[in-house]
Amino acid sequence: MEEASEGGGNDRVRNLQSEVEGVKNIMTQNVERILARGENLEHLRNKTEDLEATSEHFKTTSQKVARKFWWKNVKMIVLICVIVFIIILFIVLFATGAFS
């Protein structure tokens, strides 16, 4: 009788050990996943910082380019105004006979 009860006890101990091993494996997997997630978050943070620096550089460069083209436009408008003024001046001078 004692052997039968001991055999049942051994089975119960083995079952408990098996469950403990299963829980241990699950916990190990969970810890590994958490560590992997932490690494992924670190990688994403680094990417975000790089993108932020790149976007800041792009913003600065685009502002410089916009300013450069604005000045080109202003110079062109001033040049056109000067040419139109000179043409009008010649027309007025010819009309009044200043060159005769």
From Swiss-Prot:
Manganese is among the record's keywords: no
Subunit-structure text: Forms a SNARE complex composed of VAMP8, SNAP29 and STX17 involved in fusion of autophagosome with lysosome. Found in a number of SNARE complexes with NAPA, SNAP23, SNAP25, STX1A, STX4, STX7, STX8 and VTI1B. Interacts with PICALM. SNARE complex formation and binding by PICALM are mutually exclusive processes for VAMP8. Interacts with SBF2/MTMR13. Interacts with RAB21 (in GTP-bound form) in response to starvation; the interaction probably regulates VAMP8 endolysosomal trafficking. Interacts with STX17; this interaction is increased in the absence of TMEM39A. Interacts with TRIM6.
Every v-SNARE coiled-coil homology domain range: 12-72
Transmembrane segments: 76-96
Tissue specificity as recorded in UniProt: Platelets.
Protein's UniProt name: Vesicle-associated membrane protein 8
Short name of any one Pfam family annotated for the protein: Synaptobrevin
Subcellular location: Lysosome membrane; Early endosome membrane; Late endosome membrane; Cell membrane
One GO CC annotation: secretory granule membrane
Record topology, Cytoplasmic segments: 1-75
Membrane topology, Vesicular segments: 97-100
Phosphothreonine: residues carrying this PTM: 28, 48, 54
Site (Interaction with STX8): 33
Database matches in PANTHER family: SYNAPTOBREVIN FAMILY MEMBER (PTHR45701)
A single GO molecular function term of this UniProt record: syntaxin binding
Lipidation ((Microbial infection) N6-stearoyl lysine): 64, 68
InterPro entries noted in UniProt: Synaptobrevin-like (IPR001388), Synaptobrevin/VAMP (IPR016444), V_SNARE_CC (IPR042855)
GO biological process: autophagosome maturation; autophagosome membrane docking; defense response to virus; mucus secretion; negative regulation of secretion by cell; positive regulation of histamine secretion by mast cell; protein transport; regulation of protein localization to plasma membrane
Lineage: superkingdom: Eukaryota
